Amino acid sequence: MFSKETYTNRRKVLQGLVEKGVIIFLSGNECPNNYPANTYYPFRPDSSYLYFFGIIRDGLAGVIDVESGEVALYGDDVDVADIVLTVPVESLASQAEKVGVKKTGTFQQFLDYIKAEQAKGRQIHFLPPHRHQEKLLLQDTLGIHHTKQTEAASIELIKAVVKMRSVKEEQEIAEIEKACEIGYKMHTAAMIAGKPGVTEKYVGAVVTGEAMKYGWQVSFPTILTMHGEIMHGGPQFKEIEDGRLVLCDAGCENENFYCSDHTRTFPANGKFTQQQREIYTIVEQCHD
């Protein structure tokens, strides 16, 4: 999380880029495995919500009233029944204060507020949703069928967010560089482990484990394969063959959800053949 001033300033800039209406950002929800409370998948907040509100927590909604300038965060505090499945969690009001938001409320209050503002004829700005929970929520709240929400999303808000997030702040660049440092270690680990006789699965696990050693996650499932001609080929239970080239496409996501994403190709036995080296050099020169 960045400073309170960072999020306050970002929201002020956004208000200046959208003419009128109410802007909403949803943090997203935990993803259950086999029953609702069994959510051991790592929670990943929506990136645009995170950019403007910063709190890493599921089930939140950030709201910006463009005309009045009022900003609010809505969500439900963790109750006694939930605490047995989680570590103690700060109240939403306490968390909101850290990102410069004074007004908070329950998630039901958010739903009631949005319905009331829509009934007044105000435009509700939202970005194209990509998670089914958010699609169903928008359908129930705004009356927009889930198959029509991409078209109904606010073009004005999309352009404003793209304009802001396309230019990285110094602190964001530092976060990306942190992720790239671990990404480098992931790829060198692949080159060390990726020898003839071991499986692609094994090397893929080594690469993924390199990110997890630092308490981070991979930014996407590791791609490691002798068949680089197949786009996004995941590692298989195939032994790496002597003389083959191995493609590794991998990266990590740090604790602030900034990512690295590198692709490298290396010879399994540590040495290029003459033909491999010539082709590799041509591709490298074209890239550079």
Language-model segments: residues:
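Active-site neighborhoods and metal-handling regions in enzymes and metal-associated proteins
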Residues: 1-288
